A protein has these predicted regions:
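N-terminal/domain-start alpha-helical segments
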Residues: 1-123
Length: 124
């Protein structure tokens, strides 16, 4: 079972992501702030990370940069920030995708599945 870390401070959004992912056979962990999320991402084994940008403790851009220094797993940014500059910055720091809130939960699951399939092909 693929394991996904959700780093999201909005409990409602985190639970929505969790519910849809678990209904599709994924195992999930939730971190509600940047520092906890970064520690989990670096200290535990995950197959993919869903990462918000605006987080208490440490922002998602910093977390993305830090994860990319040591891990090669898909990172999908899920953020209310919809300006091109934010998308370009996130992708430039190593995110594999950038999804703007509000989002379709079914589209989120489809993107997660697509990124996991591509990473699996690249690493096998």
């Amino acid at each position: 079972m693929k394991r996904i870390l959700i780093i999201e401070d909005d409990q409602g959004i985190a639970e929505l992501e969790r519910d849809y992912l678990e209904a599709n056979g994924f195992s999930t962990d939730i971190a509600a702030d940047g520092k906890t999320g970064e520690a989990k991402a670096l200290g535990e084994a995950y197959d993919l990370i869903l990462l918000d940008i605006m987080l208490p403790g440490r922002d998602g851009f910093q977390i993305c940069r830090t994860i990319r220094e040591t891990k090669d797993i898909p990172i999908l940014i899920v953020s209310a920030r919809q300006e091109d500059i934010d998308k370009i910055r996130g992708l430039g720091l190593g995110a594999d995708d950038y999804i703007v809130k509000p989002f379709s939960p079914n589209e989120l699951v489809a993107r997660v599945k697509g990124h996991l399939a591509r990473y699996e092909q690249l690493t096998s």
